[in-house]
Design a protein with these regions (language model features):
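Glycine/serine-rich phosphate-binding loop and adjoining beta1-alpha1 elements at the start
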Residues: 94, 113-227
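Structured beta-strand/loop patches that form or line metal/cofactor-binding pockets in enzymes
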Residues: 40-69
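N-terminal Rossmann-fold NAD(P) dinucleotide-binding loop
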Residues: 240-241
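Single conserved hydrophobic/aromatic residue that forms the stacking wall/gate
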Residues: 287-299
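Hydrophobic Val/Ile/Leu positions in short beta-strands of Rossmann-like dinucleotide-binding domains
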Residues: 231-233
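NAD(P)-binding Rossmann-fold cofactor-contacting core
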Residues: 252-286
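Glycine-rich Rossmann-fold phosphate-binding loop(s) that bind the pyrophosphate
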Residues: 236
């Protein structure tokens, strides 16, 4: 494998897509030794076929805000690879979303899904729409407008989206509701749905729990016990909540969590009722951390 040659070719085809190019290079460097032991891979141009997405959909999403003004965002779906199953990957709503980021995420999702040994391909989608500061009605209207285009390209045997940053059970519910209306079908087209219409009970905490199980096994492999360790968690959503909860159960002490507005530090530990209370405030859009807080006082 000639990594420099591959990257030169990709840079010419995808100029300016730094996130995607960096992700590809990191993967190539990590598999180079093993790949070079299999000349049949080179003969089949396996890498060249893996690094390019199967197809990309880009579309405009016009929607009406609470003031009656029409807003227009961009929507994307990158169907990266379905060699072993339907495309599978989340939908992200965040102002930073662009095609390079989604290609990078879809590329890595292909490998993550393959490692589960389940028949799932890789994909990713989203929009530069940010739910932050938007009303429930605005978020609903945007999700419905987004699905007016995306519904043609997803389905239980084609492409199965899920949530990601900015997309939780509420947003998935809005999108799935519009999908059902357009297709007149109730199928397994989305994961991350609410319990009331076929979702999984452990979905909210699954990612955070899984991350801590992985960390715990890595520490054990090094002969280190997680009990008594001090932990800092970057994030303030479902993944962070699951990670904090499981870290505490395993005997570690989480002293800080962070969000887009700042962070909370509590040397006595952030867990249990404290984090549940903060997540409740966040869900109600009442919490705003404007300055770093050294000792959080939560009663």
């Amino acid at each position: 494998m000639d990594i420099n040659q591959i990257m030169t070719s990709l840079e010419a085809k995808h100029p300016g897509e730094s996130e995607y190019l960096q992700a590809v290079k990191e993967v190539l460097l990590s598999i180079e030794d093993i790949y070079n032991q299999h000349p049949e891979f080179e003969k089949a141009s396996l890498i060249e076929r893996l690094v390019e997405p199967d197809r990309i959909f880009t579309f405009k999403v016009p929607w009406v805000d609470d003031k009656g003004k029409v807003q227009v965002n961009l929507g994307y779906r990158v169907q990266f690879n379905n060699a072993i199953g339907p495309y599978k990957g989340g939908i992200r709503f965040h102002a930073s979303v662009n095609l390079s980021i989604l290609k990078f995420l879809g590329f890595e999702q292909t490998f993550k899904n393959a490692l589960t040994t389940l028949p799932m391909g890789g994909g990713k989608g989203g929009s530069d729409f940010s739910p932050r500061g938007k009303s429930d009605a605005e978020i609903m209207r945007f999700c419905q407008a987004f699905m007016l285009e995306l519904w043609r390209h997803v389905g239980p045997d084609m492409d199965v989206p899920a949530g990601d940053i900015g997309v939780g059970g509420r947003e998935v519910g809005y999108m799935f509701g519009m999908y059902k209306k357009l297709t007149r079908e109730f199928t397994g087209t989305f994961t991350g749905k609410g319990l009331e219409f076929g979702g999984s009970l452990i979905r909210p905490e699954a990612t955070g729990f899984g991350g801590l199980y992985f960390v715990n096994q890595m520490l054990k492999a090094k002969g280190i016990d997680i009990k008594g360790k001090t932990v800092a968690v970057s994030g303030f959503g479902n993944v962070a909540w699951g990670a904090v909860t499981k870290a505490t159960e395993l005997g570690a002490k989480v002293v800080t969590i962070s969000g887009p507005d700042g962070y909370i530090y509590d040397p006595d530990g952030v867990s249990g009722d404290k984090i549940d209370y903060m997540l409740e405030l966040r869900a109600l859009s009442l919490i705003h951390i404007s300055e770093p807080t050294r000792h959080a006082q939560i009663s």
